[in-house]
Regions:
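Glycan-recognition surfaces in beta-rich domains, encompassing non-catalytic CBMs
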Residues: 1-144
Length: 144
């Protein structure tokens, strides 16, 4: 991505269920790599949490830690169709693994609205419905 950057979680418009966890230290379940602690994350632990964020560019993703408690997230861009993603990886049962999931990679250039929510679905191996990430990974113009 030739214009890739991290957009702050502070730009999110929280509808319900999300909170910023300052200086995140892990959940007590699953190991955490030392470079992933002490960072502010935005986190939702239950189904139905929703937020929206405006961004400018052609791609958006979530740099997250996919641990033992993550579930299936759903998102849409602008007024598009809802899509879903199981965040759980083959390492998630024992580790909050850092992972960047690119939700959209080939959007038309311009300003877009990402709506993100947690669902009531999860991987059979997961113990929860959580989602937590540190920023929005955007390919596009830096916002002012």
């Amino acid at each position: 991505y030739d214009r890739g950057h991290f957009q702050s979680i502070k730009t999110a418009n929280i509808k319900n269920g999300w909170k910023v966890v300052k200086n995140w230290q892990g959940t007590g379940k699953g190991r955490v790599r030392k470079h992933d602690v002490g960072i502010d994350y935005i986190e939702a632990l239950t189904p139905g949490a929703e937020l929206a964020v405006e961004f400018s560019g052609t791609a958006i993703g979530l740099p997250m830690v996919a641990g033992p408690d993550v579930g299936v997230i759903e998102w849409k861009i602008d007024n598009g169709q809802w899509k879903s993603l199981d965040q759980f990886t083959k390492w998630s049962s024992g580790l909050h693994i850092p992972w960047i999931y690119m939700l959209e990679k080939e959007l038309p250039e311009g300003t877009h609205l990402l709506t993100l929510r947690t669902s009531n679905r999860k991987n059979d191996q997961s113990i929860g419905y959580a989602c937590r990430f540190r920023a929005f990974a955007v390919n596009g113009k830096l916002s002012d």
